Each structure stands twice: as structure tokens, then as C-alpha cells.
Amino acid sequence: MKTIVLKLGGEIVHSPELDLVARDLRTLVDGWNRVAIVHGGGPQATALQKRLGLETRMVAGRRFTDEATLEVMKYVVAGRLNVDLCGRLLANGVMPVGLHGASGHAIQATRRPPRVMQGAGPEPVDLGLVGDVVGFNLPLLGDLFERRYVPVLACLGCDDAGQALNINGDTVASQLAGALRADALVLVTSTPGVLRDVKDPSSRIPRITRAEFERLVADGTISGGMIPKLEESFEVLRGGARSVVILGKLAPGDLEAAVLEPGSAGTVLVGE
């Protein structure tokens, strides 16, 4: 039995790839594997803000969240996307349970204090109603796993006073993987894994250790935005997860293979 945390971007919720994910999830859950899903909704939130005439303000790649933006996030992430995602999973034989921070305090958070952020100047930045994860309701998730339900967590946390807080979906997924001591955190992306040649999908690197990552950066194989993404993934391993899988451009069976046969699909990152 394995414990898997799956991170889905908002863009996949209404894509054909979701049905491939759902079918593999059913196979994994039928095999008594424990699966939790974390999803975001950034593109849909930005689109709704534009329709409503609201400014989308980004600071160092993070969304500034005022009261109006938080209302949009509630509607989009905890509302429409969570319901639509659960519906698609249900249609494929998976039994999902939609959750957010206020659902049994599933995602426990505190408001992030102002802090200096890389790329945002020397002064501390206040991101508004943005939260930092301080814990999860692990007994609740454990009960759902025992009954072969799949928790589907929208990336909204909640503090002890009941205030909803916007949290980056990758952050929620990474910290949940650590808290569960997950066998794998699977990041579904737009690429089939880490590539030696970004123009050649067949140049996928099946497995990377920390030492190999440093060598690939030094020789220029890994460059640009992939460097911080992989740095963050190796931090997840230090936080308690056993592996991180980068997976995309899915074919039938890819998710199942990536979890049960590490390296057979996507790229698996391991600590050593």
C-alpha cells in the first residue's frame, strides 16, 4: 500500500487528461493505495477577476489577495472547480470527498506576516489574505483513506477564527506530502518530465538524485525555470516525502506506472 499526493493545476480540471488521471486513480484506490488530491485554480480565478473588472495583482509570482480576490477564490477554487473535479472523478468510478480549509479544518493555516520576497525589493511585502500551512486534520484524512475515499482539497486554508486564507496549491501539496510521509508527490504538468532536450519529448530523464541534479545544472542540461522547480521538489523530500514525480502529456496508464514502477513514466526525484 502506498500513500500518494497528486497535485493538479486548475488547467487540467476541464481537460481530457483528467479522465486518464481518474481511471488510473481508480486502479490505485482499488489496490488499497491511499490517494489525496490537491488542486489550484489560478487561470480560472484570473479569468473571473477580468470578467468582474477586478485587478489581478501579482507580487513576485504570488497573487495579492484582498477581500474581493478571496471571494473569487472561494467561488472558483472551493466552489466550481472542486465540484467539477469531484464530478469527473465520480463519473470514472472514484469516490471523491471535496474539502477546503474550513471542512473539518482540513487545512490549518495562519495569515502570512509581511516578509521580504525575492524579486520584490528590499521592503517586507504584505500579500493580504494569504496563509501559511501550519497543519492538516490527519485523522479526518485517515478515516477517508480507510474507506477508500479520495480527499480532494482546494487550496484554501482556514485559521482558528474561521478566516479563509488563500494558499499556493503547490505549497499545500508539498506540505501535505510531508505530513503524510507520502511515498510520492505527483506533480501533473505540461511536460512529460525533465528532458535533456526541451524540444525532444523522447529525451526524458527517468530518475534524478540530488547529486545528479547538481551535475545536470552544472553542465547546462537543466536550466532556467526548471532549476527552482526542482530545488523546491528536493525540499519536499527533506520534508518527509519519499519521492517526487513530475508527469505530464499523459497517456493511458502513465499515472499508475509512475507510482507503482518509479521512472517508467515522467521523472522521479529521490533523495539519494
Curated annotation (Swiss-Prot):
GO terms for cellular component: cytoplasm. Substrate binds at residues 41-42, 63, 166. Keywords: Amino-acid biosynthesis, Arginine biosynthesis, ATP-binding, Cytoplasm, Kinase, Nucleotide-binding, Transferase. Pathway: Amino-acid biosynthesis; L-arginine biosynthesis; N(2)-acetyl-L-ornithine from L-glutamate: step 2/4. It catalyses: N-acetyl-L-glutamate + ATP = N-acetyl-L-glutamyl 5-phosphate + ADP. The record marks 7, 229 as: Transition state stabilizer. Pfam families: AA_kinase. The keyword ATP-binding applies. Its EC number is 2.7.2.8. The keyword ATP-binding applies. One of its GO terms (biological process) is arginine biosynthetic process via ornithine. It is found in: Cytoplasm. It is an enzyme of class 2 (transferase). One of its GO terms (molecular function) is ATP binding. Belongs to the acetylglutamate kinase family. ArgB subfamily. Catalyzes the ATP-dependent phosphorylation of N-acetyl-L-glutamate. This is Acetylglutamate kinase. It comes from Anaeromyxobacter sp. (strain K). The lineage of its organism: Bacteria, Pseudomonadati, Myxococcota, Myxococcia, Myxococcales. The gene is argB.
